[in-house]
Amino acid sequence: MRAPNYARPLLLSILLGATGLTPAHAQGRPFLEWAGELSLVRSGGGDTTWQISRVAGGVQEDGRYGWTLAGEHHRRGDLGDWVGQANAFRRAGVWIVSGGVGLAADPEFIYRQSLEGELARIVGRGFVVHGGYRYLRYRDATVHMIQPAVSWYLRGHEVQARGFVVRNATTDEQSGTVLLRANLEASPRVRLAAGTALGTRIFDATAIRNTNAEAWVVFGFARIVVTPHFTVVAGAGGAHEEPMFDQRTLSLGARWTF
């Protein structure tokens, strides 16, 4: 029996952003990284665990360009899915273009195909405006996501507000979420990050119809540069979505830069 759940990962994508710097601040040379996530989940009155493991490698060159190839294994209870991903970005003057693709073979709960792209422009005084789109094709649904955002960079710190306008084309359901996050350079070796998201159907774009499915997410991370080549990230977070979903998550990641 296939899982009727299209939930998105809570923390892993944010963990990866904390492991390496954002494209506008990427530091050069090839890298390898690993990330893992363990969640205690209560859904529909039952308790289960979700796990994500990720290995990746790529290149980032001084904020000018970069690419990443990754493999992920997602497990929810007794069900497991594998997914392959490729992402890249390129900066040209004040413009930054990025995109990615994800593919899974005969998945139980994760998407079959994912396509995304974003165009960002540096507008001055540390501000960057973004416009993004993501297409997600599941076994039983097609989801479109529009993602406007604005970021502010100041002396190594960053604040971002990002919106998610989500439409399930299969059921014609729509939802929206706002994500606020910030990271700061506490010291040359330590970067701290935290954020929150508020909205509806954050975890399931095909949530129970005729319900508000109001949801929230909170998270925090610490990124520590152990050596010039080795970085670790530890994080924690929690989430709730009406009427009956709760999640508590711990994450750990590491990156080796050559």
Label each residue range with its predicted role.
Residues V59-E61, R90, R121, W152, ...:
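Residue-level signature of outer-membrane beta-barrel architecture
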